[in-house]
């Protein structure tokens, strides 16, 4: 997969290029990243990429000309039909389903805004989709872009050493992940790993993990549960959990 990054701070993407799973994917030629700095496409000696907002108001707005030139260059590099995604708090919320959808593209151009945002006419002329990583505001689109890239890259076949790592991730099946434990089996304070995980019975371990995924999602993200078509067995697990929870409260 090819990524084109429109950013005035391309150095920030060393975090993607140089570390972890994403760096390995780049080294293995499964991913390529090209950065296009709008400052390189300006026409004035100060390399100005922003200006005051028409109508007044605090903050500066990123200019149309350098951004459009950077996007055009990115399209020439990645392909004229490459989808342009603007990282914006006004966009649709990014989630696992959206990641899977974006993964269908061979290439993506990620536009990272700064200041008060970008000239609206640029969005009208070039942006195919606006995406938000949450209902909060950051200083720029670089961190959201890296978040989106990391999420997509780990879904690319063979990027992760064990394909089960992807399947067992939170949200892969619409549920949160189950609890994980490592050595020692018992901590000095007596806190021990659930016995089923030490049993070697893979069928029982799988049942325990499924139960934990359902309960954890129900407790922490009921909105996710409501969107799923649960099996009769899954529904029974949750019904039993609710009954046990009520009984436990009654005994306190």
Curated annotation (Swiss-Prot):
Function (record text): Specifically methylates guanosine-37 in various tRNAs.
Transcription found in the keyword field: no
NCBIfam families: PRK00026.1, trmD
A Pfam family recorded for this sequence: tRNA_m1G_MT
Localisation: Cytoplasm
Protein name listed in UniProt: tRNA (guanine-N(1)-)-methyltransferase
Gene: trmD
Top EC group: transferase
Top-rank taxon: Bacteria
Quaternary organization: Homodimer.
Annotated S-adenosyl-L-methionine binding sites: 113, 133-138
Upper lineage: Bacteria, Pseudomonadati, Pseudomonadota, Gammaproteobacteria, Thiotrichales
